[in-house]
UniProtKB/Swiss-Prot annotation:
This is Resolvase. Residues 15-159 form the Resolvase/invertase-type recombinase catalytic domain. InterPro entries: Recombinase_CS (IPR006118), Resolv_N (IPR006119), Resolvase-like_N_sf (IPR036162), Resolvase_HTH_dom (IPR006120), SSR_resolvase (IPR050639). It holds the Pfam family Resolvase. Belongs to the site-specific recombinase resolvase family. The active site is at S23. One of its GO terms (molecular function) is DNA binding. Involved in plasmid partition. GO terms for biological process: DNA integration; plasmid partitioning. Keywords: DNA integration, DNA recombination, DNA-binding, Plasmid, Plasmid partition.
Length: 219
């Protein structure tokens, strides 16, 4: 693997950080590996791969924040899909992109702003036009990602209402295995934050499960 020191003198190393969805699905993993390979084939040194469990509709994603903190000037963030970067409302999504650019980094998303387009040599008016088009495409893609997220939530809400009306809705199924792990860890003295991290859920969910279990024990 190339390092900064191994590059020929005078040649600037192109560095990328890749942001992905955490997945165990074989097809998703193959697609992600293809993205990593394509980034390297484009001449980029991959300084980090960040696999996120949290939803793109959240601004406080741990891996996203870690990646932004790691960014150095001149680097490129390569996202698997635009909705991995953000499903936030457009204003919040633009602030997120601005925080990446504030570190002196650029954003590349296949099909929106490709690595080849970022590397394109342009000066003067041509450069301004190219960057303006890239910004417009990125803004449009961010808005479409948010619209898709809201459409999915609305369809889910309508589905729940129809199921309730038909007497078929029973609510979200309990994950017995996850609940058991939470109870075991908390009973062993693990903090709420540590338990949430180990189990892969939110601290609020740990609190709910633990409170429900304690209430059951007191009956």
């Amino acid at each position: 693997m190339a390092t900064r020191e191994q590059q020929p003198e005078g040649r600037r190393l192109k560095v990328a950080r890749i942001y992905l969805r955490a997945s165990t699905d074989e097809q998703n993993l193959e697609r992600q590996e293809s993205l990593v390979a394509a980034t390297r084939a484009a001449g980029y040194y991959v300084a980090g791969i960040y696999r996120e469990k949290a939803s793109g509709a959240r601004a406080d994603r741990p891996e996203l924040l870690r990646m932004i903190a790691d960014l150095q000037p001149g680097e490129v963030v390569v996202a698997e899909k635009i909705d991995r970067i953000s499903r936030l409302p457009l204003a919040e999504a633009e602030r997120l992109v601005a925080s990446i650019r504030a570190k002196g980094a650029k954003l590349a998303v296949p099909g929106v702003v490709d690595l080849s387009e970022l590397a394109a040599e342009a000066n003067g008016v041509a450069k301004i036009v190219l960057e303006s088009v890239q910004d417009m495409l990125l803004k449009l893609a961010l808005q479409m990602a948010r619209d898709d997220y809201e459409d999915r939530r609305e369809r889910q809400r309508q589905g729940v209402q129809l199921a309730k009306a038909a007497g078929r809705y029973t609510g979200r199924k309990r994950d017995a295995g996850m609940h058991d792990r939470i109870i075991t860890l908390r009973s062993g003295g693990s903090s709420i934050a540590k338990t949430a991290k180990l189990v892969g859920c939110s601290p609020s969910q740990v609190k709910r499960v633990w409170a429900a279990w304690n209430a059951q024990q007191q009956k």
